[in-house]
UniProtKB/Swiss-Prot annotation:
One GO CC term, this protein: extracellular region
Family label: Belongs to the bradykinin-potentiating peptide family.
Species per Swiss-Prot/TrEMBL record: Brachycephalus ephippium (Pumpkin toadlet)
Subcellular location, record wording: Secreted
Lineage: Eukaryota, Metazoa, Chordata, Craniata, Vertebrata
UniProt KW Transferase keyword: no
Annotated tissue distribution: Expressed by the skin gland.
Keywords of the record: Amidation, Hypotensive agent, Secreted, Vasoactive
Designated name of the protein: Bradykinin-potentiating peptide Brachy
GO-annotated biological processes: blood vessel diameter maintenance; regulation of blood pressure
Function: The amidated peptide increases the release of nitric oxid (NO) and that NO mediates the endothelium-dependent vasodilatation. In addition, it inhibits efficiently angiotensin I-converting enzyme (ACE) in rat serum (IC(50)=8.2 uM). 3D-structure modeling of this peptide in complex with ACE suggests it acts by inhibiting the ACE C-terminal catalytic site.
Modified how: Both amidated and non-amidated peptides have been observed in skin secretions.
Residues where Proline amide is found: P8
Length: 8
């Protein structure tokens, strides 16, 4: 699965 989207 793709990695979780993390906002900086």
């Amino acid at each position: 699965w793709p990695p979780p989207k993390v906002s900086p």
